[in-house]
Amino acid sequence: ITAYVYEKFMNVTYEPEKREGILFVGGFGHAPNLDAVQWFLDKIYPDVYKNIKANFYIVGSKAPDEITHITTEGVIVKGFVSEEELKQLYNSCRLVVVPLRYGAGVKGKVVEALYYGIPVVTTSVGAEGIGGIENIAIVEDQEQKLVNAICEVYQNDDKLIEMSEKSQRYVREKFSTEAVWDIVKEDFE
């Protein structure tokens, strides 16, 4: 049974022309998140920024100095934010990246992004435990493929809209109270 259950849904009308930037969400008290951001900043973001000039918003509590003191052009470190500010970021950024290289289990940050209808680009580690995610998100592990995928989808309004619609439909089908009760019923039959 999933730990992520929603009673109400966002019904986001994704409007790419009103959105900008790439968002990462994850607490830095968890080592895989720090590794993910450092790897993204070192190996992926420079080429992404060179190609599409997209800002990179970093959200997460307990950000260490090496994150909070970043001066890289285009990088905006938000640190810890309120639920309201996080919701605003989900509703104003074009896509979420989850560049995890290690860690286990279903990633709440991926499910939450899908819930908000924001397109997701992740690694296979970020996709772990979310059946069928490759049909609604972009899953890549190789650095250059991640760069290419982010740049291509970021500039493709139709693809962004399609991914947003698919992610919201997926959350309704897999993470609604009804879906979870159906799983419980199946387990007891």
List each language-model region with its residue ranges:
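Conserved catalytic-core segment of nucleotide-activated headgroup transferases in glycan assembly
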Residues: 3-85, 91-92
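Glycosyltransferase donor-binding loop in the core domain
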Residues: 29-32, 105, 138, 172
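Glycine-rich phosphate-binding loop at the start of an alpha helix
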Residues: 34, 87, 107, 161
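Acidic donor-binding loop of glycosyltransferase active sites
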Residues: 91-105, 118-119
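Short hydrophobic beta-strand element within catalytic cores of glycosyltransferases
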Residues: 109-113, 119-122
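Short acidic/histidine- and often glycine-rich active-site loop of Leloir-type glycosyltransferases
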Residues: 124-139
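Conserved acidic donor-binding segment of nucleotide-sugar-dependent glycosyltransferases
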Residues: 136-144, 152-157
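A charged, aromatic-enriched C-terminal amphipathic alpha-helix characteristic of glycosyltransferases
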Residues: 158-188
